[in-house]
């Protein structure tokens, strides 16, 4: 017959008799077990930095070297100092213009400058008058003969000149927009 002792080991009955007769051993020190870290979705700052350097470290150096090859030699030291925020220098106008022109040349060929939209002369009316208080806006607008809103209203039983509802008690005329030039807000 086997007996299980507190520490989880198996001993036989003859061993148990010897254990009872012998003095108890000194208590063991408990082992400190570090809790296992669960793998997280996000990297720690150190891990992220290492991964970034592995992925982009070489490419970044290549880009910097490529950029430096396009800059004139007299501008190299200035551009490196200007790159640092703490030592921003006011450079000569000619040098800054040269640098801007070189950067424009370095843009990818696929990107094009935006074209300005030309306004047609007849599309904008120049004789717009300032409207006075109480002037009704849109009264001369043509009636809408087709549209989603009109179709929905007709499906509910509406027809021109009648109100909406079972007894045609709703508004017959459209809502009128009236100009209010004063700055008092809504009334």
UniProtKB/Swiss-Prot annotation:
Q: What biological-process GO terms show up in the record?
A: meiotic cell cycle; ribosome biogenesis
SMART domains documented for this protein: G_patch
Molecular-function GO terms, alphabetical: nucleic acid binding
Name the residue ranges with Basic residues bias.
26-41
Its GO CC terms?
cytoplasm; mitotic spindle; mitotic spindle pole body; nucleus
Question: What keyword terms does UniProt attach to this protein?
Answer: Cell cycle, Cytoplasm, Cytoskeleton, Meiosis, Nucleus
Q: Does the UniProt entry include the keyword Nucleus?
A: yes
| Family annotation (PANTHER family) | G PATCH DOMAIN CONTAINING PROTEIN 2
| Biological function | Has a role in meiosis and sporulation. Required for meiotic chromosome segregation.
Q: What is this protein called?
A: Meiotically up-regulated protein C1442.13c
Provide the species name: Schizosaccharomyces pombe (strain 972 / ATCC 24843) (Fission yeast)
